[in-house]
Amino acid sequence: MFCEQCEQTASGNGCHQWGACGKSPEVNAVQDLLIYCLRGLATVVLKARENHIPTQKMDVFICEALFATMTNVNFNNKSLTEYLKTCINLREKLKQTLEETLNTPPSWSDLSNYQPDWEDSLVTQGETLVHRFISRSSNDLDIISLKLTVLYGLKGVASYTFHAQELGQEDEKVYQFIEDALVKLERTDLSLQEWIDLALKVGEINLRAMELLDAGHTQTYGHPTPTQVPLNPKKGKAILVSGHDIRQLEAILQQTADKDITVYTHGELLPAHGYPKLKQNYPHLYGHYGTAWQNQTKDFAKFPGAIIITTNCLMPPHETYDEKLFTIGPVSYPHLTYLPPTETGIPDYSPAIKKACLMPGFTEETEPRHVMVGFARNTVLSVSDQVIEGVKTGKIRHFFLVGGCDGAKPGRTYYTELVEKVPSDCIVLTLACGKFRFFDKQLGEIEGLPRLMDVGQCNDAYSAIQIALGLANAFNVSVNEIPLSLILSWYEQKAIAVLLTLLYLGIQNIRLGPTLPAFITPNVLQFLQDNYHLQPITTPDEDLAACLN
Protein backbone atom coordinates (compact mmCIF):
# COMPACT_ATOMS: atom_id res chain seq x y z
CA MET A 1 0.00 0.00 0.00
CA PHE A 2 1.17 3.52 -0.79
CA CYS A 3 -0.97 6.55 0.07
CA GLU A 4 0.04 9.97 1.31
CA GLN A 5 -2.78 12.13 -0.01
CA CYS A 6 -4.13 13.36 3.36
CA GLU A 7 -2.72 15.29 6.30
CA GLN A 8 -3.15 12.44 8.76
CA THR A 9 -1.07 9.97 6.74
CA ALA A 10 0.77 7.56 9.04
CA SER A 11 3.83 8.98 10.83
CA GLY A 12 3.73 11.93 8.46
CA ASN A 13 5.34 9.96 5.63
CA GLY A 14 2.63 7.83 4.03
CA CYS A 15 0.31 4.94 4.84
CA HIS A 16 1.86 1.57 3.95
CA GLN A 17 -0.01 -0.96 6.11
CA TRP A 18 -3.50 0.52 6.53
CA GLY A 19 -4.98 3.93 5.80
CA ALA A 20 -5.15 6.37 8.69
CA CYS A 21 -8.59 7.22 7.26
CA GLY A 22 -9.69 3.59 7.70
CA LYS A 23 -9.08 2.62 4.08
CA SER A 24 -7.82 -0.94 3.61
CA PRO A 25 -4.84 -1.78 1.37
CA GLU A 26 -7.27 -3.61 -0.91
CA VAL A 27 -9.49 -0.55 -1.35
CA ASN A 28 -6.44 1.62 -1.92
CA ALA A 29 -5.19 -0.70 -4.67
CA VAL A 30 -8.53 -0.74 -6.51
CA GLN A 31 -8.64 3.07 -6.28
CA ASP A 32 -5.20 3.17 -7.89
CA LEU A 33 -6.40 0.82 -10.62
CA LEU A 34 -9.46 3.03 -11.18
CA ILE A 35 -7.30 6.15 -11.50
CA TYR A 36 -5.10 4.41 -14.08
CA CYS A 37 -8.13 3.40 -16.12
CA LEU A 38 -9.60 6.91 -15.85
CA ARG A 39 -6.39 8.20 -17.40
CA GLY A 40 -6.95 5.79 -20.27
CA LEU A 41 -10.54 6.98 -20.66
CA ALA A 42 -9.28 10.57 -20.62
CA THR A 43 -6.99 9.78 -23.56
CA VAL A 44 -9.95 8.62 -25.65
CA VAL A 45 -12.16 11.52 -24.54
CA LEU A 46 -9.53 14.03 -25.67
CA LYS A 47 -9.43 12.38 -29.08
CA ALA A 48 -13.23 12.45 -29.28
CA ARG A 49 -13.33 16.14 -28.37
CA GLU A 50 -10.79 16.89 -31.11
CA ASN A 51 -13.23 15.33 -33.54
CA HIS A 52 -16.34 17.10 -32.20
CA ILE A 53 -17.87 13.95 -30.72
CA PRO A 54 -19.98 14.65 -27.59
CA THR A 55 -18.17 13.72 -24.37
CA GLN A 56 -20.31 15.23 -21.58
CA LYS A 57 -21.34 11.88 -20.13
CA MET A 58 -17.70 10.79 -19.88
CA ASP A 59 -16.61 14.20 -18.56
CA VAL A 60 -19.01 14.01 -15.62
CA PHE A 61 -18.19 10.35 -14.96
CA ILE A 62 -14.46 11.08 -14.75
CA CYS A 63 -15.13 13.79 -12.15
CA GLU A 64 -17.40 11.57 -10.07
CA ALA A 65 -15.01 8.62 -10.21
CA LEU A 66 -12.04 10.78 -9.20
CA PHE A 67 -14.23 12.10 -6.36
CA ALA A 68 -14.72 8.50 -5.20
CA THR A 69 -10.94 8.14 -4.70
CA MET A 70 -10.69 11.11 -2.33
CA THR A 71 -10.06 10.66 1.38
CA ASN A 72 -13.09 9.53 3.42
CA VAL A 73 -15.40 9.03 0.44
CA ASN A 74 -15.53 5.44 -0.81
CA PHE A 75 -14.35 2.43 1.21
CA ASN A 76 -16.27 -0.16 -0.80
CA ASN A 77 -14.47 -2.35 -3.35
CA LYS A 78 -17.79 -3.50 -4.80
CA SER A 79 -18.71 0.11 -5.55
CA LEU A 80 -15.23 0.95 -6.85
CA THR A 81 -15.33 -2.09 -9.13
CA GLU A 82 -18.59 -0.82 -10.62
CA TYR A 83 -16.89 2.51 -11.34
CA LEU A 84 -14.06 0.55 -12.94
CA LYS A 85 -16.40 -1.46 -15.17
CA THR A 86 -18.28 1.68 -16.21
CA CYS A 87 -14.98 3.35 -17.03
CA ILE A 88 -13.90 0.52 -19.33
CA ASN A 89 -17.34 0.31 -20.98
CA LEU A 90 -17.44 4.05 -21.68
CA ARG A 91 -13.91 3.94 -23.04
CA GLU A 92 -14.54 1.03 -25.39
CA LYS A 93 -17.82 2.46 -26.71
CA LEU A 94 -16.16 5.80 -27.37
CA LYS A 95 -13.23 4.10 -29.12
CA GLN A 96 -15.70 2.25 -31.32
CA THR A 97 -17.48 5.50 -32.18
CA LEU A 98 -14.18 7.10 -33.14
CA GLU A 99 -13.09 4.13 -35.22
CA GLU A 100 -16.42 4.16 -37.08
CA THR A 101 -16.36 7.94 -37.58
CA LEU A 102 -12.79 8.66 -38.65
CA ASN A 103 -11.37 7.77 -42.02
CA THR A 104 -8.13 6.72 -40.38
CA PRO A 105 -8.71 4.78 -37.13
CA PRO A 106 -6.68 6.16 -34.20
CA SER A 107 -3.63 4.36 -32.91
CA TRP A 108 -4.32 3.67 -29.24
CA SER A 109 -1.68 3.71 -26.51
CA ASP A 110 -1.18 1.06 -23.85
CA LEU A 111 -2.90 3.47 -21.44
CA SER A 112 -6.08 3.61 -23.51
CA ASN A 113 -6.01 -0.12 -24.28
CA TYR A 114 -5.47 -1.40 -20.74
CA GLN A 115 -7.97 -4.11 -19.87
CA PRO A 116 -8.32 -5.25 -16.25
CA ASP A 117 -8.34 -9.00 -15.76
CA TRP A 118 -11.70 -9.46 -14.06
CA GLU A 119 -10.87 -13.06 -13.15
CA ASP A 120 -7.61 -12.13 -11.47
CA SER A 121 -7.03 -10.00 -8.39
CA LEU A 122 -7.86 -6.36 -9.07
CA VAL A 123 -5.89 -5.56 -5.93
CA THR A 124 -2.69 -7.05 -7.34
CA GLN A 125 -3.22 -5.20 -10.63
CA GLY A 126 -3.68 -1.90 -8.80
CA GLU A 127 -0.56 -2.43 -6.72
CA THR A 128 1.46 -3.18 -9.85
CA LEU A 129 0.25 -0.06 -11.62
CA VAL A 130 0.98 2.33 -8.77
CA HIS A 131 4.49 0.92 -8.49
CA ARG A 132 4.90 1.49 -12.22
CA PHE A 133 3.60 5.05 -11.84
CA ILE A 134 6.33 5.77 -9.30
CA SER A 135 9.10 3.98 -11.19
CA ARG A 136 8.22 5.74 -14.48
CA SER A 137 8.88 9.04 -12.71
CA SER A 138 12.56 7.97 -12.61
CA ASN A 139 14.47 8.51 -9.40
CA ASP A 140 13.62 12.20 -9.24
CA LEU A 141 11.70 12.53 -5.99
CA ASP A 142 10.84 16.14 -6.77
CA ILE A 143 9.06 15.17 -9.98
CA ILE A 144 7.22 12.40 -8.13
CA SER A 145 6.22 15.02 -5.54
CA LEU A 146 4.84 17.36 -8.18
CA LYS A 147 3.07 14.55 -10.05
CA LEU A 148 1.29 13.62 -6.82
CA THR A 149 0.49 17.29 -6.18
CA VAL A 150 -1.13 17.48 -9.61
CA LEU A 151 -3.08 14.24 -9.11
CA TYR A 152 -4.34 15.16 -5.65
CA GLY A 153 -5.22 18.67 -6.79
CA LEU A 154 -7.17 17.23 -9.72
CA LYS A 155 -9.29 15.23 -7.28
CA GLY A 156 -10.28 18.47 -5.56
CA VAL A 157 -11.04 20.18 -8.87
CA ALA A 158 -13.11 17.17 -9.96
CA SER A 159 -15.22 17.26 -6.79
CA TYR A 160 -16.12 20.93 -7.23
CA THR A 161 -16.78 20.39 -10.94
CA PHE A 162 -19.08 17.47 -10.16
CA HIS A 163 -21.13 19.57 -7.73
CA ALA A 164 -21.27 22.50 -10.16
CA GLN A 165 -22.70 20.37 -12.98
CA GLU A 166 -25.41 19.10 -10.62
CA LEU A 167 -26.55 22.72 -10.53
CA GLY A 168 -26.31 23.20 -14.28
CA GLN A 169 -22.94 24.96 -14.33
CA GLU A 170 -20.32 23.49 -16.68
CA ASP A 171 -17.30 24.66 -18.64
CA GLU A 172 -15.82 22.34 -21.25
CA LYS A 173 -12.40 23.90 -20.65
CA VAL A 174 -12.44 22.57 -17.08
CA TYR A 175 -13.26 19.06 -18.22
CA GLN A 176 -10.64 19.25 -20.95
CA PHE A 177 -7.94 20.35 -18.52
CA ILE A 178 -8.75 17.58 -16.03
CA GLU A 179 -8.49 15.00 -18.79
CA ASP A 180 -5.35 16.49 -20.32
CA ALA A 181 -3.62 16.60 -16.93
CA LEU A 182 -4.61 12.99 -16.19
CA VAL A 183 -2.97 11.94 -19.44
CA LYS A 184 0.14 14.05 -18.74
CA LEU A 185 0.72 12.03 -15.55
CA GLU A 186 2.00 9.29 -17.87
CA ARG A 187 4.67 11.59 -19.31
CA THR A 188 8.32 11.03 -18.44
CA ASP A 189 9.79 13.83 -20.55
CA LEU A 190 8.52 16.89 -18.67
CA SER A 191 10.98 19.02 -16.73
CA LEU A 192 10.68 20.04 -13.11
CA GLN A 193 9.57 23.53 -14.18
CA GLU A 194 6.93 22.07 -16.47
CA TRP A 195 5.50 20.07 -13.56
CA ILE A 196 5.51 23.21 -11.41
CA ASP A 197 3.65 25.05 -14.17
CA LEU A 198 1.11 22.22 -14.43
CA ALA A 199 0.51 22.26 -10.67
CA LEU A 200 -0.17 26.00 -10.80
CA LYS A 201 -2.47 25.42 -13.78
CA VAL A 202 -4.45 23.05 -11.53
CA GLY A 203 -4.88 26.04 -9.22
CA GLU A 204 -6.05 28.24 -12.08
CA ILE A 205 -8.63 25.71 -13.25
CA ASN A 206 -9.77 25.11 -9.68
CA LEU A 207 -10.54 28.82 -9.40
CA ARG A 208 -12.84 28.42 -12.40
CA ALA A 209 -14.42 25.28 -10.92
CA MET A 210 -15.13 27.12 -7.66
CA GLU A 211 -16.54 30.04 -9.64
CA LEU A 212 -18.92 27.65 -11.42
CA LEU A 213 -20.04 26.13 -8.13
CA ASP A 214 -20.50 29.59 -6.63
CA ALA A 215 -22.67 30.52 -9.61
CA GLY A 216 -24.68 27.32 -9.21
CA HIS A 217 -25.35 28.02 -5.55
CA THR A 218 -26.08 31.74 -5.81
CA GLN A 219 -28.18 31.59 -8.99
CA THR A 220 -30.25 28.73 -7.58
CA TYR A 221 -30.57 29.73 -3.93
CA GLY A 222 -29.67 33.43 -3.82
CA HIS A 223 -26.61 35.08 -2.33
CA PRO A 224 -26.02 34.10 1.31
CA THR A 225 -27.23 36.58 3.91
CA PRO A 226 -26.38 36.75 7.62
CA THR A 227 -28.55 34.10 9.25
CA GLN A 228 -28.90 32.81 12.78
CA VAL A 229 -28.71 29.00 12.90
CA PRO A 230 -29.99 27.07 15.94
CA LEU A 231 -27.62 24.52 17.46
CA ASN A 232 -30.27 23.14 19.77
CA PRO A 233 -32.67 20.50 18.38
CA LYS A 234 -36.42 20.74 18.67
CA LYS A 235 -38.95 17.98 19.38
CA GLY A 236 -39.91 15.70 16.53
CA LYS A 237 -38.72 13.25 13.91
CA ALA A 238 -35.39 14.14 12.37
CA ILE A 239 -33.03 13.62 9.43
CA LEU A 240 -29.39 14.71 9.51
CA VAL A 241 -27.67 15.58 6.22
CA SER A 242 -23.87 15.60 6.16
CA GLY A 243 -21.27 16.46 3.52
CA HIS A 244 -21.16 19.35 1.06
CA ASP A 245 -23.90 18.74 -1.53
CA ILE A 246 -26.48 21.53 -1.27
CA ARG A 247 -28.38 20.29 -4.35
CA GLN A 248 -28.96 16.94 -2.64
CA LEU A 249 -29.89 18.72 0.58
CA GLU A 250 -32.60 20.53 -1.36
CA ALA A 251 -33.81 17.22 -2.84
CA ILE A 252 -34.10 15.79 0.67
CA LEU A 253 -36.03 18.88 1.76
CA GLN A 254 -38.37 18.47 -1.21
CA GLN A 255 -39.02 14.81 -0.46
CA THR A 256 -39.61 15.46 3.27
CA ALA A 257 -42.00 18.38 2.79
CA ASP A 258 -45.31 17.88 4.64
CA LYS A 259 -43.98 14.77 6.40
CA ASP A 260 -43.49 16.43 9.79
CA ILE A 261 -39.75 15.73 9.74
CA THR A 262 -37.19 18.32 10.77
CA VAL A 263 -34.01 18.41 8.68
CA TYR A 264 -30.68 19.28 10.29
CA THR A 265 -27.33 19.95 8.65
CA HIS A 266 -24.04 18.46 9.75
CA GLY A 267 -20.44 19.39 8.97
CA GLU A 268 -19.85 21.48 5.87
CA LEU A 269 -23.57 21.87 5.16
CA LEU A 270 -23.87 24.45 7.95
CA PRO A 271 -23.49 27.36 5.45
CA ALA A 272 -26.57 26.12 3.54
CA HIS A 273 -28.71 27.94 6.12
CA GLY A 274 -27.46 31.26 4.72
CA TYR A 275 -29.04 30.76 1.29
CA PRO A 276 -32.34 32.70 1.39
CA LYS A 277 -34.32 30.56 -1.06
CA LEU A 278 -33.59 27.39 0.90
CA LYS A 279 -34.81 28.98 4.12
CA GLN A 280 -37.86 30.54 2.46
CA ASN A 281 -38.98 27.45 0.57
CA TYR A 282 -38.25 24.81 3.19
CA PRO A 283 -39.16 25.90 6.72
CA HIS A 284 -38.40 22.39 8.03
CA LEU A 285 -34.70 23.08 7.43
CA TYR A 286 -34.23 24.02 11.04
CA GLY A 287 -30.76 23.87 12.54
CA HIS A 288 -27.30 22.37 12.71
CA TYR A 289 -26.29 19.30 14.69
CA GLY A 290 -22.78 18.29 15.71
CA THR A 291 -19.44 19.74 14.73
CA ALA A 292 -16.64 18.64 12.40
CA TRP A 293 -16.38 15.32 10.57
CA GLN A 294 -13.91 13.67 12.96
CA ASN A 295 -16.48 13.85 15.78
CA GLN A 296 -19.15 11.97 13.82
CA THR A 297 -18.84 8.69 15.71
CA LYS A 298 -20.08 10.52 18.79
CA ASP A 299 -22.54 12.82 16.99
CA PHE A 300 -24.10 10.11 14.81
CA ALA A 301 -24.50 7.67 17.68
CA LYS A 302 -26.57 10.23 19.60
CA PHE A 303 -28.68 11.49 16.71
CA PRO A 304 -32.21 9.99 17.05
CA GLY A 305 -33.05 9.90 13.33
CA ALA A 306 -31.80 8.93 9.89
CA ILE A 307 -28.45 10.23 8.62
CA ILE A 308 -27.55 10.82 4.96
CA ILE A 309 -23.93 11.26 3.84
CA THR A 310 -23.75 13.23 0.58
CA THR A 311 -19.95 13.55 0.23
CA ASN A 312 -16.81 13.31 2.34
CA CYS A 313 -16.00 13.01 5.13
CA LEU A 314 -17.29 9.55 6.06
CA MET A 315 -15.47 7.62 8.77
CA PRO A 316 -15.77 3.84 9.18
CA PRO A 317 -19.12 3.66 11.00
CA HIS A 318 -19.79 2.04 14.34
CA GLU A 319 -22.39 -0.69 14.58
CA THR A 320 -24.26 1.51 17.07
CA TYR A 321 -25.52 3.69 14.22
CA ASP A 322 -24.76 2.03 10.87
CA GLU A 323 -28.37 0.90 10.38
CA LYS A 324 -29.58 4.51 10.27
CA LEU A 325 -26.78 5.68 7.95
CA PHE A 326 -27.36 6.15 4.20
CA THR A 327 -24.91 7.11 1.45
CA ILE A 328 -25.35 8.57 -2.04
CA GLY A 329 -23.28 9.57 -5.08
CA PRO A 330 -19.60 8.64 -4.84
CA VAL A 331 -19.87 7.80 -1.13
CA SER A 332 -20.00 4.14 -0.17
CA TYR A 333 -19.08 1.78 2.65
CA PRO A 334 -19.70 -1.98 2.88
CA HIS A 335 -22.98 -2.86 4.62
CA LEU A 336 -24.32 0.71 4.62
CA THR A 337 -27.52 1.37 2.67
CA TYR A 338 -26.70 3.05 -0.63
CA LEU A 339 -29.38 5.16 -2.33
CA PRO A 340 -28.69 5.08 -6.09
CA PRO A 341 -29.47 8.05 -8.34
CA THR A 342 -32.55 8.00 -10.55
CA GLU A 343 -32.43 9.23 -14.15
CA THR A 344 -32.58 12.80 -12.83
CA GLY A 345 -29.47 12.24 -10.72
CA ILE A 346 -31.55 12.52 -7.53
CA PRO A 347 -31.98 9.43 -5.34
CA ASP A 348 -35.29 8.27 -3.96
CA TYR A 349 -34.82 9.14 -0.30
CA SER A 350 -37.84 7.08 0.84
CA PRO A 351 -35.75 4.49 2.76
CA ALA A 352 -34.12 7.23 4.83
CA ILE A 353 -37.45 8.97 5.37
CA LYS A 354 -39.05 5.72 6.54
CA LYS A 355 -36.14 5.09 8.90
CA ALA A 356 -36.55 8.59 10.36
CA CYS A 357 -40.26 7.97 10.93
CA LEU A 358 -39.52 4.71 12.76
CA MET A 359 -36.97 6.32 15.07
CA PRO A 360 -37.88 8.30 18.20
CA GLY A 361 -36.61 11.67 17.05
CA PHE A 362 -35.92 14.36 19.61
CA THR A 363 -38.20 14.08 22.62
CA GLU A 364 -37.28 17.24 24.49
CA GLU A 365 -36.12 20.79 23.93
CA THR A 366 -32.74 22.05 25.08
CA GLU A 367 -31.44 25.49 25.94
CA PRO A 368 -31.28 27.70 22.81
CA ARG A 369 -27.86 28.16 21.23
CA HIS A 370 -27.02 29.55 17.83
CA VAL A 371 -24.28 30.63 15.44
CA MET A 372 -24.26 33.06 12.53
CA VAL A 373 -23.56 32.14 8.90
CA GLY A 374 -23.91 33.93 5.57
CA PHE A 375 -20.93 36.29 5.41
CA ALA A 376 -20.05 35.54 1.80
CA ARG A 377 -18.68 38.07 -0.66
CA ASN A 378 -21.92 39.98 -1.34
CA THR A 379 -22.54 40.54 2.35
CA VAL A 380 -18.99 41.60 3.19
CA LEU A 381 -18.43 43.74 0.11
CA SER A 382 -21.79 45.46 0.64
CA VAL A 383 -20.27 47.07 3.74
CA SER A 384 -16.85 47.66 2.16
CA ASP A 385 -17.10 51.41 2.80
CA GLN A 386 -17.58 50.69 6.49
CA VAL A 387 -14.67 48.24 6.45
CA ILE A 388 -12.39 50.69 4.63
CA GLU A 389 -13.28 53.48 7.04
CA GLY A 390 -12.57 51.15 9.95
CA VAL A 391 -9.12 50.34 8.57
CA LYS A 392 -8.30 53.98 7.79
CA THR A 393 -9.30 55.15 11.27
CA GLY A 394 -7.40 52.32 12.95
CA LYS A 395 -10.49 50.72 14.46
CA ILE A 396 -9.81 47.62 12.34
CA ARG A 397 -6.12 46.75 12.53
CA HIS A 398 -5.99 43.43 10.69
CA PHE A 399 -7.97 40.62 9.07
CA PHE A 400 -7.25 36.95 9.66
CA LEU A 401 -8.59 34.23 7.39
CA VAL A 402 -8.49 31.16 9.62
CA GLY A 403 -10.02 28.19 7.89
CA GLY A 404 -9.67 24.98 5.95
CA CYS A 405 -10.14 21.36 6.94
CA ASP A 406 -10.48 20.07 10.46
CA GLY A 407 -9.04 16.77 11.65
CA ALA A 408 -8.29 14.64 14.68
CA LYS A 409 -4.67 15.58 15.38
CA PRO A 410 -4.08 17.27 18.76
CA GLY A 411 -2.04 20.01 17.04
CA ARG A 412 -5.23 21.45 15.58
CA THR A 413 -6.00 23.08 18.93
CA TYR A 414 -3.58 25.72 17.61
CA TYR A 415 -6.42 27.21 15.56
CA THR A 416 -8.75 27.52 18.56
CA GLU A 417 -6.08 29.18 20.65
CA LEU A 418 -5.07 31.53 17.86
CA VAL A 419 -8.62 32.80 17.30
CA GLU A 420 -9.11 33.26 21.03
CA LYS A 421 -5.93 35.35 21.15
CA VAL A 422 -6.64 37.52 18.09
CA PRO A 423 -6.71 41.13 19.39
CA SER A 424 -10.07 42.84 19.77
CA ASP A 425 -9.33 45.29 16.95
CA CYS A 426 -9.01 42.47 14.40
CA ILE A 427 -11.62 40.56 12.36
CA VAL A 428 -11.56 36.80 11.74
CA LEU A 429 -12.96 35.38 8.50
CA THR A 430 -13.43 31.63 8.40
CA LEU A 431 -14.60 28.90 6.06
CA ALA A 432 -14.74 25.10 5.69
CA CYS A 433 -14.91 22.67 8.59
CA GLY A 434 -11.85 24.10 10.31
CA LYS A 435 -14.30 26.68 11.69
CA PHE A 436 -15.72 24.14 14.12
CA ARG A 437 -12.70 24.68 16.35
CA PHE A 438 -14.13 28.11 17.21
CA PHE A 439 -17.38 28.71 15.29
CA ASP A 440 -19.43 29.30 18.44
CA LYS A 441 -17.02 31.76 20.07
CA GLN A 442 -18.58 35.10 20.97
CA LEU A 443 -15.97 37.57 19.72
CA GLY A 444 -18.18 40.65 19.69
CA GLU A 445 -18.18 43.45 17.10
CA ILE A 446 -16.17 46.35 15.74
CA GLU A 447 -18.35 49.32 14.79
CA GLY A 448 -21.30 47.00 14.15
CA LEU A 449 -19.25 44.47 12.17
CA PRO A 450 -19.01 40.96 13.66
CA ARG A 451 -15.45 40.04 14.56
CA LEU A 452 -16.11 36.44 13.45
CA MET A 453 -17.58 35.99 9.97
CA ASP A 454 -18.34 32.60 8.41
CA VAL A 455 -17.72 32.89 4.65
CA GLY A 456 -19.00 29.36 3.91
CA GLN A 457 -17.85 25.95 2.71
CA CYS A 458 -14.35 25.03 1.53
CA ASN A 459 -15.34 25.86 -2.06
CA ASP A 460 -16.33 29.32 -0.83
CA ALA A 461 -12.63 30.04 -0.87
CA TYR A 462 -13.78 31.62 -4.14
CA SER A 463 -15.90 34.05 -2.13
CA ALA A 464 -13.03 34.77 0.25
CA ILE A 465 -10.76 35.47 -2.72
CA GLN A 466 -13.32 37.93 -4.12
CA ILE A 467 -13.49 39.67 -0.74
CA ALA A 468 -9.70 40.01 -0.67
CA LEU A 469 -9.59 41.27 -4.26
CA GLY A 470 -12.43 43.70 -3.55
CA LEU A 471 -10.62 45.17 -0.55
CA ALA A 472 -7.36 45.36 -2.49
CA ASN A 473 -9.10 47.27 -5.29
CA ALA A 474 -10.72 49.61 -2.79
CA PHE A 475 -7.33 50.42 -1.25
CA ASN A 476 -5.70 50.48 -4.70
CA VAL A 477 -3.03 47.99 -3.63
CA SER A 478 -2.24 44.33 -4.32
CA VAL A 479 -3.79 41.54 -2.26
CA ASN A 480 -0.44 40.99 -0.57
CA GLU A 481 -0.45 44.60 0.66
CA ILE A 482 -3.79 44.63 2.47
CA PRO A 483 -3.79 43.88 6.24
CA LEU A 484 -4.77 40.24 5.78
CA SER A 485 -3.11 37.03 6.98
CA LEU A 486 -4.07 33.55 5.78
CA ILE A 487 -3.67 30.83 8.39
CA LEU A 488 -4.94 27.60 6.90
CA SER A 489 -5.52 24.04 8.01
CA TRP A 490 -5.60 21.21 5.51
CA TYR A 491 -6.67 17.57 5.49
CA GLU A 492 -7.73 16.30 2.07
CA GLN A 493 -7.50 16.94 -1.64
CA LYS A 494 -9.94 19.84 -1.94
CA ALA A 495 -7.62 21.77 0.34
CA ILE A 496 -4.71 20.96 -1.98
CA ALA A 497 -6.66 22.35 -4.94
CA VAL A 498 -7.51 25.52 -2.98
CA LEU A 499 -3.87 25.98 -1.92
CA LEU A 500 -2.78 25.66 -5.56
CA THR A 501 -5.36 28.32 -6.46
CA LEU A 502 -3.92 30.71 -3.89
CA LEU A 503 -0.40 30.07 -5.21
CA TYR A 504 -1.59 30.59 -8.78
CA LEU A 505 -2.95 33.99 -7.69
CA GLY A 506 0.45 34.85 -6.25
CA ILE A 507 -0.76 35.15 -2.67
CA GLN A 508 2.18 35.28 -0.26
CA ASN A 509 2.90 34.43 3.36
CA ILE A 510 0.35 31.65 3.79
CA ARG A 511 0.74 29.74 7.03
CA LEU A 512 -0.22 26.08 6.68
CA GLY A 513 -0.75 23.35 9.23
CA PRO A 514 -1.00 21.44 11.39
CA THR A 515 1.73 19.64 9.39
CA LEU A 516 2.97 20.07 5.85
CA PRO A 517 2.00 17.53 3.15
CA ALA A 518 4.00 14.31 3.20
CA PHE A 519 4.19 14.31 -0.59
CA ILE A 520 6.06 17.64 -0.67
CA THR A 521 9.81 17.07 -0.86
CA PRO A 522 12.32 19.43 0.79
CA ASN A 523 13.27 20.90 -2.60
CA VAL A 524 9.66 21.58 -3.59
CA LEU A 525 9.02 23.10 -0.16
CA GLN A 526 12.08 25.31 -0.57
CA PHE A 527 10.72 26.50 -3.91
CA LEU A 528 7.40 27.40 -2.27
CA GLN A 529 9.15 29.20 0.56
CA ASP A 530 11.48 31.11 -1.76
CA ASN A 531 8.77 32.16 -4.21
CA TYR A 532 5.63 32.41 -2.07
CA HIS A 533 6.93 32.59 1.51
CA LEU A 534 4.72 29.60 2.35
CA GLN A 535 5.49 28.55 5.90
CA PRO A 536 4.34 26.04 8.51
CA ILE A 537 2.43 27.27 11.54
CA THR A 538 4.49 27.62 14.73
CA THR A 539 2.68 28.74 17.88
CA PRO A 540 -0.33 31.06 18.11
CA ASP A 541 1.67 33.72 19.94
CA GLU A 542 4.59 33.66 17.50
CA ASP A 543 2.39 33.68 14.42
CA LEU A 544 0.14 36.46 15.72
CA ALA A 545 3.16 38.58 16.53
CA ALA A 546 4.61 38.01 13.06
CA CYS A 547 1.32 38.80 11.31
CA LEU A 548 0.74 41.98 13.28
CA ASN A 549 4.30 43.25 13.06
UniProtKB/Swiss-Prot annotation:
Names of the cofactor(s): [4Fe-4S] cluster; hybrid [4Fe-2O-2S] cluster
CDD domains: HCP (cd01914)
Residues annotated to bind hybrid [4Fe-2O-2S] cluster: H244, E268, C313, C405, C433, C458, E492, K494
Localisation: Cytoplasm
Family matches, as Gene3D superfamilies: 1.20.1270.20, 3.40.50.2030
CC terms in the record's Gene Ontology section: cytoplasm
Record text on cofactor binding: Binds 1 [4Fe-4S] cluster.
Cysteine persulfide PTM positions: C405
Annotated catalysed reactions: A + NH4(+) + H2O = hydroxylamine + AH2 + H(+)
Entry-linked InterPro entries: HCP/CODH (IPR004137), Hydroxylam_reduct (IPR010048), Prismane-like_a/b-sand (IPR016099), Prismane-like_sf (IPR011254), Prismane_a-bundle (IPR016100)
Record keywords, A-Z: 4Fe-4S, Cytoplasm, Iron, Iron-sulfur, Metal-binding, Oxidoreductase
Gene Ontology molecular-function annotations: 4 iron, 4 sulfur cluster binding; hydroxylamine reductase activity; metal ion binding; peroxidase activity
Keyword Iron listed: yes
Listed EC numbers: 1.7.99.1
Binding residue positions for [4Fe-4S] cluster: C3, C6, C15, C21
HAMAP family hit by this protein: Hydroxylam_reduct
Name assigned to this protein: Hydroxylamine reductase
Native source organism of the sequence: Gloeothece citriformis (strain PCC 7424)
Chain's gene name: hcp
